[in-house]
Swiss-Prot record:
Broad enzyme group: transferase
Name of the protein: Hyaluronan synthase
Pathway: Glycan biosynthesis; hyaluronan biosynthesis
Homology family: Belongs to the NodC/HAS family.
GO BP annotation list: extracellular matrix assembly; hyaluronan biosynthetic process; single-species submerged biofilm formation
Organism expressing this protein natively: Streptococcus pyogenes
Length: 419
């Protein structure tokens, strides 16, 4: 990033965080809500501060035998074809590209892929297409490919994702460090322009990678290598394949949360990192109902895998601390909101109500300050995501925790997003 843009981001963050500190002290002081505000501000400063120090890996990647694995279920035909074309266009050679259809009821996509592979023989010599007779879930679809490949490195790609031509090459630069066992790229919404929800989702994605994963990467322990674009060393996948396919939680089989699970396997071996120069765009839900179902699935996966991460507190305290921070911030927010609503000692007049709303807006702007130089106009929508996060996504997260044993996590009937 040019020094001018980076300086602008840092100065803007300092300005916004200063206002946030003042408003929090004025509005809530040393109350429960005020204490939460202090902890939140501290956490923001730590995460944003680390993200400002982040630098991507450089150098020429070593020679690896790489296999791409693309599971698909009832995917849009053109979307899957675009995914395949983007993988074929990689600047780093792939030894194998597996497309595994997981028993789709709508076979248009896999038929289109088969026709394309048969027609474009010269460029598709290393493409292997497989149709499963029954729907077993994403993990089993991936495992079909893992079991048949002797690759040194596996590239995982979601079926609704476009990966940039140099994405794999950039990811593999991180593997020049032999202590790195998994890496993920930067994700944005391909359909960002569709409506307000997709714009807000893109803002959230940019923060999740450009801030959260950048900060975690600096410590060598990102918590999730995202499904749309990640690489894993063979040692991460193959020894854990049976565990991966047959994972259970509270006595029930686990079918999703694959990326978090694989990341935990990688953490057991070494470092997991983020490579900002490896980029991809993915389709995101544009209807609120589908979006909330997706978030519900992700929330349940977050809580399940967080339990596993916290257990690593002796072997890998940094991973446990990142996880504990996320869980504690969620729990404290619930307590703070309850205190705000039901504690009669806190009297909200119009001025304080305006200040409270201002805090929500400024927190959102602080979280997404990186987005300011990328899409300045859309950056101003960040407060809307703050409202969505506080009044919709946080209650949904609590609901997900309370219903974590319910395996009916919801999918889209026509097109399932595997995330």
């Amino acid at each position: 990033m040019p020094i001018f843009k980076k300086t602008l981001i840092v100065l803007s963050f300092i300005f916004l965080i200063s206002i946030l500190i003042y408003l929090n002290m004025y509005l809530f002081g040393t109350s429960t809500v005020g204490i939460y505000g202090v902890i939140l501000i501290t956490y923001l400063v730590i995460k944003l501060g680390l993200s400002f120090l982040y630098e991507p890996f450089k150098g020429k990647p070593h020679d690896y035998k790489v296999a791409a694995v693309i599971p698909s279920y009832n995917e849009d035909a053109e979307s899957l074809l675009e995914t395949l074309k983007s993988v074929l266009a990689q600047t780093y050679p792939l030894s194998e590209i597996y497309i595994v259809d997981d028993g789709s009821s709508n076979t248009d996509a896999i038929q289109l892929i088969e026709e394309y592979v048969n027609r474009e023989v010269d460029i598709c010599r290393n493409v292997i297409v497989h149709r499963s007779l029954v729907n077993k879930g994403k993990r089993h679809a991936q495992a079909w490919a893992f079991e048949r490949s002797d690759a040194d490195v596996f590239l995982t790609v979601d079926s609704d994702t476009y990966i940039y031509p140099n994405a794999l090459e950039e990811l593999l630069k991180s593997f020049n460090d032999e202590t790195v066992y998994a890496a993920t790229g930067h994700l944005n919404a391909r359909n960002r322009q569709t409506n307000l929800l997709t714009r807000l989702t893109d803002i959230r994605y940019d923060n999740a990678f450009g801030v959260e994963r950048a900060a975690q990467s600096l410590t060598g322990n990102i918590l999730v290598c995202s499904g749309p674009l990640s690489i894993y060393r063979r040692e991460v996948i193959i020894p854990n394949l049976e565990r991966y396919k047959n994972q259970t939680f509270l006595g029930l089989p686990v079918s999703i949360g694959d990326d978090r699970c694989l990341t935990n396997y990688a953490i057991d071996l070494g470092r997991t990192v983020y490579q900002s120069t490896a980029r991809c765009d993915t389709d995101v839900p544009f209807q609120l109902k589908s979006y909330l179902k997706q978030q519900n699935r992700w929330n349940k996966s977050f809580f399940r895998e967080s339990i596993i991460s916290v257990k690593k507190i002796l072997s890998n305290p940094i991973v446990a601390l990142w996880t504990i921070f996320e869980v504690v911030m969620f729990m404290m927010l619930i307590v703070a909101i309850g205190n705000l609503l039901f504690n009669q000692a806190i009297q909200l007049d119009l001025i304080k109500l305006f200040a409270f709303l201002s805090i929500i807006f400024i927190v959102a702007l602080c979280r997404n300050v990186h987005y300011m130089v990328k899409h300045p106009a859309s950056f101003l929508l960040s407060p809307l995501y703050g409202i969505l996060h506080l009044f919709v996504l946080q209650p949904l997260k609590l609901y997900s925790l309370c219903t974590i044993k319910n395996t009916e996590w919801g999918t889209r009937k026509k097109v399932t997003i595997f995330k």
